[in-house]
A protein has these predicted regions:
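Flexible, low-complexity junctional segments that flank or bridge functional domains
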Residues: 1-216, 220-250, 332, 336-343
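Conserved acidic, small-residue-rich alpha-beta core segments centered on
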Residues: 82, 228-349
């Protein structure tokens, strides 16, 4: 296949000895070619960024329209939210497109989300220089401005960055009620801890019933996934019918899978599971048990991924309410759970 041809080409290009960053540069594009957001090679941040590493003193947000917006700059030389047009002659679109080889995902807009997280590291790996000539323009302006930035260490950079307000840690899930508008908004950030979700959901829906709140907005726009069982807990309160997030699965177990997971009871081979029979569906709660009888709206974005993506498609499939927003980051036919492991020599994970 074309993928194995790519593997062979990389093998031929590899020198006898490489650093972890160099190995990442060779190997990550091969992993990206698989086209799956759950299958990725992580950048070796700790190996690359040390106390003596000098870096571009500019932090950027990567947007889905292939533009770059300033998040922060040394001495505030480029104001926040200004648009960076080019760095050392490389236009923003060219920079982003060149990094796509290192961003795993099914859809380009989700891969850009990945680049947004790793932009500083990928930029240093690919475009490190002695100085950086930056062309930018202010928000809502067409006038091009220029500034030259010089790389600095983190210790020098940090005290010279614009001060930000300290932000409190955002909980995995929270809610607030607007009693005048009779609406509640659940801020759902992570699919974590099914037992805690049960306690949270009980409390939230009791509050909504007591206050007569008939409209619930579930905000899933900043949710990258987690444990799908958390979604099942919440679904029991809002689904009008029995539901299931996953219908069928094709499972392959290899000796490598067994070694990496430590699940020695697994048997190598292929298995097919069909859970679409009605007996395997999860029943919603009854009204007496606390089922929510109001209208539910689900907000999603390109960042809605993994367990959050499966939550979104099950929400729509079983008629739980109205979905509003952008296409989610994952696909409803996808790889299943993930296995974390480190390569034995390089330590890349």
């Amino acid at each position: 296949s074309e993928w194995f041809k790519s593997v062979n080409r990389v093998k031929q290009q590899l020198p006898d000895s490489v650093t972890t960053v160099e190995l990442f540069k060779y190997a990550a594009p091969l992993v990206t070619k698989l086209g799956d957001g759950h299958t990725m090679l992580r950048f070796p941040f700790n190996d690359y960024f040390t106390s003596s590493t000098i870096r571009l003193p500019l932090f950027l947000n990567v947007k889905s329209d292939y533009t770059l917006r300033v998040r922060g700059c040394i001495d505030n030389l480029i104001p926040q939210d200004a648009e960076v047009l080019s760095i050392n002659g490389k236009e923003s679109r060219e920079l982003i497109e060149s990094m796509m080889d290192y961003a795993s995902g099914e859809r380009d807009f989700f891969r850009i989300e990945r680049i947004n997280s790793d932009f500083s590291a990928l930029f240093e790996m690919m475009y490190a220089a002695d100085k950086y000539d930056v062309v930018y323009r202010m928000k809502d302006s067409k006038k091009k401005l220029e500034v030259t930035l010089h790389p600095t260490t983190w210790a020098e950079l940090l005290p010279r960055m614009p001060k930000k307000k300290e932000q409190a840690r955002v909980p995995d899930y929270s809610f607030k009620v607007d009693e005048k508008k009779k609406v509640a908004v659940m801020d759902f950030r992570s699919f974590n801890n099914p037992q805690r979700m049960k306690m949270f959901a009980d409390s939230m829906f009791v509050t909504l019933r007591e206050k007569g709140i008939k409209n619930l907005i579930i905000d899933l726009r900043n949710n990258g996934g987690g444990n799908s069982m958390v979604g099942d807990v919440l679904f029991r309160y809002i689904s009008p019918k029995p539901f299931k997030q996953m219908g069928k699965a094709l499972v392959r177990v290899t000796p490598t899978t067994i070694r990496l997971t430590g699940r020695t009871q697994m048997v190598p081979g292929w298995s097919f599971y069909n859970d679409e029979s009605k007996g395997n569906f999860i029943p919603p709660l009854t009204k007496e048990e606390g089922h929510y009888e109001g209208s539910v709206y689900l907000l999603i974005s390109h960042h809605t991924f993994s367990s959050a993506g499966s939550f979104a498609w099950a929400f729509k499939e079983f008629g739980m309410g109205t979905v509003i927003g952008e296409e989610s980051g994952g696909m409803n036919v996808s790889f299943g759970d993930i296995i974390y492991y480190k390569l034995p020599v390089s330590g890349l994970s």
